[in-house]
Amino acid sequence: MIFNFLSNFLINNQEILWLFTLLADLSFTLLLYRLFGKAGLQVAIAFSILLANLQGPKLTEIFGLQTSLGVIFYASIFFATDVLSENHGKKEAQKAVQMGFIVSIIMIVMMSLALLYQPTNQPNTAVFSQNIHNAFATIINFTPRFIIGSLLAYYISQRFDVWAFHAIKKKTGEKHLWLRNNASTMSSQ
């Protein structure tokens, strides 16, 4: 009953759902960092880029503007690369960006291979299997085209973000972390 109420509330309040999703994504990133350190941030980046690419084709309206659901997850990617840059250096941040890029390419290849498998035609599951196959094909056939453009934008913007973060750090020293985080992220958008 509470789950139904909450679901209906969020369906009818997309901006609150967006904020909840954003906070959940950033919280999971922090949790992974707290539990696993640098490796946790690398996992968070790879996971967020996968979510961004899989959910990217889904469009919705937030604050009256049409947007892709995938953009929500870029907040945690920028956050994670900034934390990596600050605490582990430019090389580690760039390595995490490259890992996210490669994980997405692997996903495209493996999901494309999965589409080649024919659904079962066993009497008890043939209709279900065909329906799932068709739904899967709808998402996966669109995803590679979406991911290729997204990956290029991701790679360029993240590399620039890491570069800008360290260029600002070189000028300000250890002071003004807020400036490095915000200026590098805003300029790389």
Where would I find each of the regions flagged by the language model?
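Hydrophobic transmembrane alpha-helices
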Residues: 1-84, 91
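Transmembrane alpha-helix boundary signature
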Residues: 54-65, 87, 109-123
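Transmembrane alpha-helix/helix-exit interface in multi-pass inner-membrane proteins
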Residues: 98, 102-125, 154, 158
